[in-house]
Amino acid sequence: MGNNGVIVIKENQMLHVFTETAPTLSEAQKLVGGLVEMVRSPTDPEIQILVNEEGLLRGLPFNEEASRLCDTGIVGDAIILKGEAKWT
């Protein structure tokens, strides 16, 4: 992904790479299918992961690719932000 960027990883493993501009809250909610929760990668402080806040409660499927990239368990669709694309 380089130093900056946005990647959306659907639960079915399809990758959608965006520009270096982070999505708006409304765009993020549409991409994750509900309320957005931001989690941080436990191993890389430059990575933020936007997920569905109710993903575990709703039983969303495990997202293997997002979990691998972020080194933490992720369910449902995920938006990965890095560098200048991070939310402040």
Language-model features: locations:
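Detector for the mature cores of small, proteolytically processed
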Residues: 2-88
